[in-house]
Amino acid sequence: MIVSPCDAPKTPVKRLRSALLASSALVCLFSAGQLWAFSLDDVAAKAKEMAGQKFEAPRSNLPNELRDMKFADYQKIRFRDDKAEWAGDKTPFKVSFYHQGMHFDTPVKINEVTATSVDEIKYDASRFDFGGLNIDPKTSEKLGYAGFRVLYPINKDDKQDEIMTMLGASYFRVIGKGQVYGLSARGMAIDTASPSGEEFPRFKEFWIEKPGPDDNHLVIFALLDSPRATGAYQLTLRPGTNTLVDVKSRMFLRDKVNKLGVAPLTSMFLFGANQPSRVPNYRRELHDSSGLSIQAANGEWLWRPLNNPKHLSISSFSVENPRGFGLLQRGRDFSQYEDLDDRYDKRPSAWIEPKGDWGKGTVELVEIPTADETNDNIVAFWKPETLKAPGEEMAFDYRLHWTMQENSIHSPDLGWVKQTQRSIGDVRQSNLIRQPDGSLAFLVDFVGPVLAALPEDKTIRSQVTTDDNVELVENNLRYNPVTKGYRLTLRVKVKDAGKATEMRAYLLREIPAEPGKEPALLVADKADEKKAAAKEAAAKEAAKPAVAKESANDQVEIAKADAPKPEAAKPEAGKADASKADAAKGDVAKADAAKADDVAKGKDGKDIQQPATEAAPTHPEPAKTLQVMTETWSYQLPSDE
């Protein structure tokens, strides 16, 4: 017979009876805790159930006096710090709330989760100071909270600072120590930049686990709803110098979507060094993020500087199981921004680190025209290649890094782009005066420990590709003693300003070849070997003039990419290794062609061997190969620039 510890019979043995009673109390307490255990599975069950039901649009409960208020008036509504959730408890985390107002017209349900219960945190008007606004108390009786903030002593032990905000749709922003709010993350994006219009899912309910006195993390669950999708999320917030958010997401479709955005990031780019302001401005740069960074599964890195285009621009980068991607703010010098109010130099980068197998898909970058910095015009997200049928679960887990230490994200084995500068191209005349020549100049600074360890290495060269919409008139690589890196200067002449132009560049280094071994980043996939062989043969045909040009001008070869298809130039980060291998093999082909120049021609056209003194040495130089030294700079010059 199996006896439940909660109903254990009495025993005449006193010590045994005491032991059983103690065991009974522990097991019953554990059972009670298990009864109230709350997890992502509970939220996922709700999301799955909703996905099988018709979408119910949220209804606004705002009175006109709150709905029609201006932003300046909305800001007057202050939350009372002494009324924060857990204000009297010994926990490092506190939670305060946003009042409804303006377009934040629909309340969200917020619950507190403890070891024994799940309870709704009810709206309480006494938690707010309305700043002299004439708000009728009766009109606010049935209101709710629009969202919430998380407070934590991240900068000083005796001061609670706001480190996370959840307000509007599925947006949330996070900062680390010494940072100020910048770009946002979202739970989900649907049909971003589609002709049919974007759908904005919203978090409709939250569950916040009450932390203990010594807890250094906060767990938040969220239920997402939208006309064509639902979702369940677990966000574990870990404050620090680099604040982390571990995200577990479970998504369900209600209906077909054209484009599902996973781990979306939203930012702002008005102007910067690569696209200067069209009107005079004391701020040289004004943006929350300066570029998109991607790390492919094969270890290659790609950097895409952002633009504020005149027309909507969408770029797709094919990557299978990416190691990471994000919108980064490269450049932390105050002198780059000169803004004492908005401190763009302290705005964090956001880096997405996928967990598990994400499969095939693309990282998509959307750049939207904007006239001022109040509009978020940059979106980046992961778009899965295939989606599951409505009602079936899709799981995407990832870690979100909010950091100002971008160098710690990047691989130390490769250099990266510190900055991209753009200016009018010019040529120095015989009188030493620089004269514009109708070209555009791009100066790309590559830096990093791997480059700093090789100062003025003459074996480092650039590999540049462009589409057919530009003429590349200069490709010059110089050592930069200030950054201990290399500066690549490109001058281009655009053929059709009405078309966007694609350019790519990275640095290579000539190293001795190891028998039977090639640098990993220069080895093409087996499927591409035939294509590489064909390109090598073509390179041999063109090698003589190319080598002669390089020798005369002391410049590296300028490679041209195939013309883009009519739709758009869509870079594919996942295929870049093969192209790098082709480029390296092409250089080997040039060497072969150069050797052919040692064979002279007679008057009758027959080959004449050179004298024996000109023959190849008995001990030829060791074979050389090329090693990729930097990430790939991938730049799009927008149309009508």
Swiss-Prot record:
Segments of skewed composition (Basic and acidic residues): 561-607
Matching HAMAP family: MdoG_OpgG (MF_01069)
Region annotated Disordered, chain positions: 535-554, 561-625
Cellular component terms (Gene Ontology): outer membrane-bounded periplasmic space
GO BP annotation list: beta-glucan biosynthetic process
Gene: opgG
Record GO terms (molecular function): carbohydrate binding; catalytic activity
Pathway(s) this gene product operates in, as recorded in its UniProt entry: Glycan metabolism; osmoregulated periplasmic glucan (OPG) biosynthesis
Family indicated by similarity: Belongs to the OpgD/OpgG family.
Protein name as catalogued: Glucans biosynthesis protein G
Broad class of the protein's primary localization: periplasm
Disulfide bonds: none
SUPFAM superfamilies assigned to the protein according to its UniProt record, in alphabetical order: E set domains, Galactose mutarotase-like
Keyword entries, A-Z: Periplasm, Signal
